[in-house]
From Swiss-Prot:
Keywords for this protein: DNA-binding, Nucleus, Transcription, Transcription regulation
Species name: Arabidopsis thaliana
Domain of life: Eukaryota
UniProt gene name: NAC043
Tissue note: Expressed in various aboveground tissues undergoing thickening of the lignified secondary wall such as anthers, filaments of stamens, the base of carpels, styles, the boundaries between siliques and pedicels, the midrib of leaf veins, and inflorescence stems, specifically in interfascicular fibers (sclerenchyma), cells differentiating into vascular vessels, and xylary fibers (secondary xylem).
MF terms (GO), sorted A to Z: DNA binding; DNA-binding transcription factor activity
UniProt-recorded name of the protein: NAC domain-containing protein 43
The keyword Hydrolase is assigned to this record: no
Domain spans labelled NAC: 16-180
Lineage of the species this protein comes from: Eukaryota, Viridiplantae, Streptophyta, Embryophyta, Tracheophyta
Gene Ontology CC annotations of this record: nucleus
Residue ranges the UniProt entry marks as DNA-binding: 116-186
Amino acid sequence: MMSKSMSISVNGQSQVPPGFRFHPTEEELLQYYLRKKVNSIEIDLDVIRDVDLNKLEPWDIQEMCKIGTTPQNDWYFFSHKDKKYPTGTRTNRATAAGFWKATGRDKIIYSNGRRIGMRKTLVFYKGRAPHGQKSDWIMHEYRLDDNIISPEDVTVHEVVSIIGEASQDEGWVVCRIFKKKNLHKTLNSPVGGASLSGGGDTPKTTSSQIFNEDTLDQFLELMGRSCKEELNLDPFMKLPNLESPNSQAINNCHVSSPDTNHNIHVSNVVDTSFVTSWAALDRLVASQLNGPTSYSITAVNESHVGHDHLALPSVRSPYPSLNRSASYHAGLTQEYTPEMELWNTTTSSLSSSPGPFCHVSNGSG
């Protein structure tokens, strides 16, 4: 009794419990609803109405096939295919305002590996063929496909009987209509008028611009931090390795600090990350700005402008143990540049001094 009362339609709408939503699968539409319709078997909850597709427009079907009061995105109905010509096989899908046009190939629907039906996709065009205006209304038309029978399963008599019954009711189909989402609403977005593809590319461009701005901020912050490190470590600044034919590799370098007036032994103590960080910084600038590649020695030389006491020749210390010259072993791994040539020329001109660049004292000597 419950099922009979729930199948009653009032004001063109099926009476269902509140919150009821109808979302059957393709297999359920074919195996349960359409098969029962074809075989005239009562459906437990009759929420799919019979519709004459040639007399109703899509928006009329939308109003007629509502199920309850819950908002819907698709609508279902049964329809009996009307032949366009009495002796032909073409289906008449014209309405008063337009026509339904098939598109693409029919899709085979399977259940447990067995073919049970077909799905045809149609688009509604306003006007008359062949100059109709395409709309956003789409229809999926499902039909049963029971004629594929294995010869080993049934006899010839049974095959003829089944084919006869199928041809008698083959006109019934179950349909689902819905409106295609209009993605062209992006034309009204603040980013400006653009096509659908252009609207998809706009966020990428914006993200790229934001990424470049963030990278530039990181670059400036890194430059400021590196310069601050150099200012704090000026008394212990270690110049990059220079290539000189008169230099020999030594491991230790002694520097006198004017604040403590004591010998400070510097041997792999000063962290050289701030020196090598210039090379990473240069590579970052080159990759972001696509400019010519800079080298760490150029950046170091420019950062030392105004600090002449770091480039003075060795000064005699009042302590005899410190009166030793030091030099750096060739260790540059960058490519040869004109700046290096200028630096090497300066180094060669100072080769007659007791020691180049390493032994530094801020004492009055």
